[in-house]
């Protein structure tokens, strides 16, 4: 409570300072000198209260570059080319960057994504017309990629279907189960494997290409087929040889090299650890404005936002039932006789997660 009283006092005195500045400006030299002293005192006052505040509120530690997985520049450069190349999709008509776009915060600005077969990007992307209209939208929206390369991230996707776990003896719990490819650098590389095998995301419809047929029969047979596309592209072969020490010719390229490159790009491209808030947490008491400080007071105080949005990444990585009914088609669980999205329960088999 002491902290909040201080902040309240700070806001009031700041208002007085602003009034004084507006009234003393453009006056005579004597008043300008008074204004100068006002501004000096204001700066000292802000530093004192903000430093005191940072010790009172339970604030997270600032994010640092060392909090993220290492991103090799050569692999990241290669990953950026793969990320925006349609070669990884079944019909070669969509890339990762179609649904994870810089202009839309690394997502697509849509409530439910329009994957393979759509036209355009972002909110203006459409499902096509007539016989070319896609059969189904992506059941859930495209995740934003910011800071997913942080080392503490242990679970991905809305239902947590990709997580760090040794349940299958390969370090990760995924839809591929024990058929997950080896030599994956991190959980981002793991996640990058799956959109290219999903019918409504990147793979396409049955009968249109070999990738979707292989993925449907046995998922781990689709990845070699995708890899062969890269192996047959001489420009990519040279880039892989340059980026990876264990690649001497096209036959050495594996799906793990492809997704490890994409992961390296995501880590480097969407890492945020230099915001004004990070600067404030490092001790720069003037990094945040008065309004931002008020918001921080609420966020970590009586609004209780930080109860769930905690830590340096503003998440505790847990799942909660927030008492909202399903709206939209969602993702129906395999073999479920009802058309419904059971959310986290699809992964956990726990009725409390429905």
Where are these regions (language model features)?
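N-terminal secretory signal peptides that target proteins for export/translocation
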Residues: 1-35
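Hydrophobic transmembrane signal anchors and adjacent membrane-proximal interface regions, especially
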Residues: 5-7, 44-46, 56, 164
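A generic alpha-helix propensity feature with a strong bias for hydrophobic helices
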Residues: 18, 25, 45-46, 63, ...
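Bacterial N-terminal signal peptides
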Residues: 40-50
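Periplasmic c-type cytochrome electron-transfer domains
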Residues: 54-354
């Amino acid at each position: 409570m002491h902290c909040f009283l201080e902040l309240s006092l700070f806001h009031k005195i700041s208002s007085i300072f602003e009034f004084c500045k507006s009234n003393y400006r453009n006056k005579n030299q004597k008043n300008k000198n008074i204004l100068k002293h006002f501004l000096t005192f204001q700066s000292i006052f802000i530093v004192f209260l903000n430093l005191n505040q940072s010790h009172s509120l339970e604030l997270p530690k600032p994010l640092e570059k060392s909090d993220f997985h290492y991103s090799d520049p050569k692999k990241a450069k290669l990953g950026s080319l793969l990320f925006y190349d349609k070669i990884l999709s079944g019909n070669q008509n969509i890339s990762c960057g179609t649904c994870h776009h810089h202009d839309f915060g690394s997502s697509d600005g849509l409530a439910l994504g329009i994957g393979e077969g759509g036209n355009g990007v972002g909110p203006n992307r459409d499902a096509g017309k007539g016989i070319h209209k896609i059969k189904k939208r992506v059941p859930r929206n495209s995740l934003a990629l910011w800071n997913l390369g942080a080392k503490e991230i242990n679970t991905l996707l809305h239902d947590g279907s990709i997580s760090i776990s040794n349940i299958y003896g390969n370090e990760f719990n995924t839809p591929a189960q024990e058929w997950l490819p080896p030599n994956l650098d991190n959980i981002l590389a793991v996640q990058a494997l799956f959109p290219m095998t999903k019918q409504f995301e990147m793979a396409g419809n049955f009968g249109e290409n070999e990738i979707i047929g292989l993925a449907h029969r046995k998922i781990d047979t689709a990845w070699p087929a995708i890899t062969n596309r890269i192996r047959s592209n001489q420009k990519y072969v040279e880039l892989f040889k340059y980026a990876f020490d264990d690649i001497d010719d096209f036959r050495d390229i594996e799906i793990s090299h492809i997704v490890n490159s994409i992961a390296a790009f995501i880590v480097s491209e969407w890492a945020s650890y230099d915001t004004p808030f990070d600067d404030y947490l490092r001790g720069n008491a003037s990094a945040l404005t008065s309004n931002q400080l008020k918001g921080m007071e609420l966020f970590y105080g009586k609004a209780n936002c930080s109860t769930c949005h905690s830590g340096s990444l503003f998440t505790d990585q847990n799942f909660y039932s927030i008492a909202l009914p399903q709206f939209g088609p969602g993702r129906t669980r395999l073999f479920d006789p009802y058309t419904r999205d059971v959310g986290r329960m699809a992964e956990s088999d726990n009725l409390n997660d429905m």
